[in-house]
Each structure stands twice: as C-alpha cells, then as structure tokens.
Amino acid sequence: MCAADGCPVAIEVFEGNTADPMTLSSQIDKLKQRFKLQRVVMVGDRGLLTSARIEQTLRPAGLGWITALRAPAIKQLAAAGGPLQPSLFDDRDMAEITSPDYPGERLVVCKNPLLAEERARKRAELLAGTENDLARIAARVQRARSPLRGAAAIGQAVGAVLGRRHMAKHFQISITDDTFSFAQNPLSIAAEAALDGIYVVRTNLPVAQSDAAATVRAYKSLSGVEHAFRSLKTVDLELRPVFHWTAPRVRAHVLLCMLAYYLQWHMRRSLAPMLFDERDPAAREAQRASPVAKAEPSPAAQRKAARKRTDPVDGEPLPVHSFHTLLGDLATLTRNVVRLGRDRLTAILATPTRTQHRALELLGLTPTA
C-alpha cells in the first residue's frame, strides 16, 4: 500500500490462492483502525476495485474510490445511443459523462492517440500471425498426402491457434470432416478499433473534491505503486526467491524488503539532483497539455540526460548516476583502523570524492570515525 506520492506505508502477505479483490476488506480496516483515517479514497486498478467489491465493501464503508471500467463495460457505454460516442473526442482527449448504470458516479472518458496507435499495431500483428497459422492448417486439410481429417481434429488444431493469440472473435470459421475455411470478421475488427486508446475512469468523488483532470491523474498515479511492486519483486530488492518455510518468517522477510524500499524511496528523492530521476515533477506535469497525454521529462531532466552531468555544484558539474551506480561509488568509502603500539587504535576515514561529498550532503549525513 502506497500513499498518493508513491511512498510505501504498509505491506501484507496473503495466501497464494487469494484473489486480489478479496484482500480489500482487510486494507480498509487497516486504514481506519491502524492509521485512524477519517476520509479515505481508494485508487485501484480494474482488477482490484471490481463492481462487486465497490458494492459490497467500499460503498457500505462510505469510502471514495477511483478505478477504471473493464472492456465489456466500455463497449456497453459505446453501444448505439450510449453516452460514449466518437464525437466526444473531436476537439479534446477527455470528457465527463454519466450513465444510469452507474448512479451517483462520474465517468471520465479518455482517448490516448499513442495508445490507440499501439493497440492498432498490435492487433494487426496478431491478426497476421493468426491468419498465417490458420493458412497452414488449411494447407494440411487440402494436401493430397496424409491430409488432416475429422472435424474434431481440425477443430482442435484451429482452437489451439485461436487460443494462442486470443483472436477467435475476429475470425469466421467453417469446419467439416474434410474442409476448413476461414476469413477475418471486418465488423468485429472495426468495432474493436473504434475503441482503441479509450479508457474510462470511474469515481464517486464530487467535482469539488476531484475534477476530471485530477481524477485521471490520481488513477494514472497507480504506475508509482506498480513501480514499487516491481522494485520489490525484481530489479531492485529481488524479494524472490523466498528461502523461508514458515508464515512468520515469510512475513518478516517481506516486511524487511518493504522497509528497504521505504529507505530507497526517500534516498532517491534526496539524491534526485545527482540521478537520472526526475527532480521536478511539478515542472514535468505543468508542461503537459492534458493529464491524458504522455508525461515528458522536465527541461532540467532532459538537460541532465543529454549532458550526463549535473547542474554546476562547487565548480565543474558532476557525473549523473543511476541509483545503483551511485551506491556503488559510495561503497568505496572506507574506514581504516590503525594500531599504534599495543593498545592504541586510531580510526581514519577515507577522504570523500566530490561526488561522494555531494551525495552525503544531499542525504544530510556527516561521516564520523
């Protein structure tokens, strides 16, 4: 669980066969009882904050929520006569609508052109791959020597191909004991293409508390939580594999990893001037024309990435680091203990380099022997 700025505040371990939505109740109790929060807004993805969880857990608890609709629900909104029509995006990429299916709630519909292009490209790639595989099956059915025969055998081969890329909805299939034919379904493809790049953010918060832009920004801030989860599991802390076999030890292991990430999160913010990390999130957000648009690095971050140097500090600019390379640099600092005579010990610290001195300064640390 993370705060709005991405700072981790709590972690809990569940049995491996527990579905994500079923973990919600305990987290609400934690927020209210342990943290004594009176007003809580839960921001979660469409897999966690499902309609069932909203109706059974969040609404009775009087909580606010921000989540997104699944593809079938978006398709219903876009049906003939529905509130979600292409004309909404003639001169904007975000609009607010309502629907009787979501009483007392606000729906913010967004269209991201870059996401639309990517989905169209991926669909074309999947269609082409599926068509090639189906053509090979058709050739097996039509060949003179040892042809593929039997509706069941042909259907099994076709099902494997369609299931691999999940493209069954976009093909019309005809199978008999000794024939097989297929064709793309243009109506299905066109209907899906019409919704490319469109997503719908759902909330019960009043406009005075969170307008459309703030609601979209809050939902997109989930990327920070996802980054924290990835950092714990893989690239940074490598939580797995877990070499523990009892529940208390597994929980202790996960808690220590979360505390390590908490420390890393604060260190990265303090060391941002020396890292490739974004130093000025407010400037990055201010240059966006819309919260739907892709976030670009701030001018300061772009200069830092281009020059591979920090802003001038005490003379020449310093090299820009990743978090890991900077830690590696700091790890070269040594503390040497010298024995003088039999009983006298003297500790001597290595003299920090300019890079190390600046890092320690940003962290508010003063090395002592």
Q: Regions from the language model: what does each represent?
A:
Residues 1-369:
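Anion-binding and metal-coordination hotspots
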